[in-house]
C-alpha cells in the first residue's frame, strides 16, 4: 500500500490525459491480415514512413476504373471496457488533377466505418460485406495531397486524422475503410481510448477513470483520502471529462487532528512538543504554556501536573491552575449584620475569571462544632459567584459565633481534586433587637374589646421580655394611638368603641431593646346588633340541624330524579345519534350534502361511488411513518398514467381483519372522497382488489400539528399561528356547510404540509375506537369512546354531536396552537375536567396569547351551544385579525376576564428542586442544560440572578424560550422570598 501511494505521488504532477492503445499497425512485424473486398481493391504492401521506417501499409489506386467500391476490414479489436474509441489514421492521397486522363470518378476522400460485435465473426473467407450493418464514423478528407512520387525529394505529404465513435457496449468491434475511387496509401492505423490518470489532489487519491461514452460525458470518480486525512463536508469526488482530463474537484480532504500538510499531497505527524487540534488548522503548533505532547501526532497537548484546562477552553489556550486564597480580610459587624471585604489572591492561576463563594457556618460558643447556616441568611449581592471583593451578610443570630470561608475559584477549580483555596474569618455577632412579628390573629371580639394572638418573632435574638401593642381607630392616624403591653403573645385590648375598625401593630422587646413594629392589621369590634345575634346563637344551631335533615331528604329525591332523567337522555342520545346519520340538512344552493356511507345497504357501494380504485402497480411503498388503528401507515409514491409522480401517505389494513373491520376501514375513504377543499386532507384513491387494502391520501411533510408545534416551540409569530387557525376554521366551515360533524377535532388530527398549510383529517374513525383503556385521551361514555378534553359538555353527557360541538373542539384546538402543543387541562384527570367544565371553569390564556384570540376561545366554550359562533363567523373574525395585526398586540391575562372563572395551572414548587437539571426538566427546557452549566450557572441560586442579557449570552435566542425561562426565574424568586426554607 505504501509503495503504491509513493508511485501515485510521483505521478501526481502528470495530470495529462492517458491514452491506452488497442491496436497500432506501426508495431506490426508481420502481415496485418486484414480482409479486402474485392481482392483487386486494397493491397497490403511493405513500405516506409517519412522517417524511412519499415511499415505495413494498405494502398489502393483504381482511379481509371469507374464505380469503385473497395472495402478493407480490420481484424477483431477488443475494446477492453472502453465506451468511446479513438482512431488515428496516417495516410497519403494523390491529387486527382495530377493524374493524366483520369475520369471524373476520381476521389481524394475515403469513408471510415465500424461494426460492434461480441465475438470474431469475420475472416478472409467470410467478411459478411452485405450483411454487416456498418455504422459510419466519418468521411475522411486529406488536408494535403501530392502530385509526384519522389521519395528522394521528400515530396510525399502525410495526413494524420483522428476520429472517435461510441458509445460501445459489446466486447469488441471491427473497423472498415471504404474507397470509392481514390489513389491513396493507408500508412498506419492506431486505435486507442482515453482515460483520466491516477492523481493525488486535495489530499485525496483518485483512481484511473475511463472517459464516458460521449465527448461531453462527465464520469464521477470517488476519491479516497490519503493516509491520515479525513473528508470535510460533502464526499470528495472529481469529474473525468471526455478528453481524459480532470475537472474541478467537489469536496476535499484535510489532514486530521495531529497531522499537518506536506507539499499538498501528504499528511505527516506533528512532532513531539507540537499539536494540531482540528482539521481546519493549517499546521502543527507548539504546545501552549504548562502543557506537553510527548508523542507524535498529538491532537491536543496534555496539561502538566497541577495545571488544568476548562471545558470551554480551546486547545490553543495555555493550561492554568487554581487560584490561591483571598487575602487581607476585613470584617465590620453591626448587630446581626456583617460586611466582609478582602483583597484578590496573589496567584490567579493564569486566569481572569476568578470569582468568590461565601461559606457560612454557625458555631457553638466554644467553636468545637459548626453547621451550615440556614437559608434565612441573606447575602448581597449574592453568596456564590461573586465577582467583587465585598459581600454584605444579614439576618444572622445575635450573640452567635460564625465562621465564614471565602473561597477563590476560577474556571478550572472544578477540575482540581482538591477543595478551593480559602481564607476563614471568625466573627461573633452583637446583641440585637428581635425581628418583626410576622402576623396577628383575632381570637375574639366584643362591643368594647378585641383579643389578639401572634407567634414569636422568627429571630428573637435573646429572651423576649414583653410585647408592646400600638392601636388606633382607622379613621384617625397613628399620632392618636394608644399603647398596651403583654408578657405573653396574647393580649386583650379593652376600652374600645362598638362597631369601630382599629389598626393594630405589635413589637417584641429583649435586653437589646424593641424590635420593629409589625405590619398594620385591621380588626373590628362588634356592633350592638352583632352582639345581640351572638346571644341568640343557639337558635341558628337548632335551625341548622333541622335544615340539614331537610337537605338530606331533598338530596335523596333529587338523586332519584337525576337518575331517571339520565336514562331518558341516554335513550334520546342513541336515537338522535342514529337520526343524524340519515339527516339531509339544508345546505346552501348548489352545495353538496354529505352522505353517510352507513346509510348504504352495501357499504362497498359507497366506496365505489366516492373513492377511486387505484391499480396497486401505480403505488410504491417506501417507509413506515406511523401506525394507525387498523394497521401501519407508510410514506410512498403514486404515479398515475399521464400524471407526474407524487408523494402520498398510505394507510394499510392489517392482515387477519374481519369483514366489519374492512368495512369500517374503508368508510373513512367513503367519507373523505366526498370532500374537496384546500384545508381538508385529499383522498387520492383506494386499493381494494389486492392485499393489503390501502387508503391513499396526499402526503403532509410536517405530520400532526400538535407534535409539530412542540418541536418548534416559540418559533412562529402570532400572525403565523392565526394563519394556521384560519385554515383549520375554513376547512371546518366547509364540513359544516356539508352537514358533516367531525366529532374528533383536535390538533393531533390536523396535518401540516411543508408550506404550513393545515388540513383536517381522521374522518369517521372516532366511532370505532378500540377499547384501549391505557389511552387516557378517549374515555368511555354511554357505550362509546369520547376525547373528553376536546368534547363539548352536551356531547359528553348526551352524545349530542353537532357542528356546535365541533366549534367547542375548535376552541380547544386554538388553545393547543397558541400554547405550542401543550396538553389541554394539563395533568388533570378526565373526571376533573368534566367537573370543572360543569362548574363553568374554562382554560386560561396561554402565555403571550392575544386577548382577542382568548375571547374567541371563550365564545367557542359557551355552555349554551346556540350561543357559540358558527365556523363562518370564526373565519370572518380571524380574517379581520389578520388584516389588522394591531388587534393582536394586547396580551390576555387571567384577571382580564372577571366574568368567567378560569382554571389556574399551579406553578411548580421551585424550592423543592436541588439542581439546575431538575428545574430545566420541570419547565421542559432541558435542551439548554449544557448551555447553563458551561456558562457557569451551576446552581439555582445563580440562576435566580439571571437576566435576559445572560440568556442571550449563553445562546438562548428564541423569544418564546426566553420568555418561558424568565417567567420561571421570576416565579422562583417570588417563592424563595416567601419561603423560609428556600435554597441558598
UniProtKB/Swiss-Prot annotation:
InterPro entries: Eph_TM, EphB1_rcpt_lig-bd, EphB1_SAM, Ephrin_rcpt_lig-bd_dom, Ephrin_rcpt_TKs, FN3_dom, FN3_sf, Galactose-bd-like_sf. Residues 619-882 form the Protein kinase domain. GO terms for molecular function: ATP binding; axon guidance receptor activity; protein-containing complex binding; transmembrane-ephrin receptor activity. Pfam families: EphA2_TM, Ephrin_lbd, fn3, PK_Tyr_Ser-Thr, SAM_1. Glycans are attached at residues 334, 426, 480. It is found in: Cell membrane; Early endosome membrane; Cell projection, Dendrite. Residues 19-201 form the Eph LBD domain. A motif (PDZ-binding) lies at residues 982-984. It is a single-pass type I membrane protein. Preferentially expressed in brain. Changing residue 928 to F: Disrupts binding with the GRB10 SH2 domain, providing evidence for phosphorylation. Disrupts interaction with GRB7 and ACP1. The chain crosses the membrane at residues 541-563. Residues 911-975 form the SAM domain. Residues 322-432, 433-528 form the Fibronectin type-III domain. It is an enzyme of class 2 (transferase). Its EC number is 2.7.10.1. It catalyses: L-tyrosyl-[protein] + ATP = O-phospho-L-tyrosyl-[protein] + ADP + H(+). The active site is at residue 744. Changing residue 707 to T: In an ovarian undifferentiated carcinoma sample; somatic mutation. Belongs to the protein kinase superfamily. Tyr protein kinase family. Ephrin receptor subfamily. This is Ephrin type-B receptor 1. The gene is EPHB1.
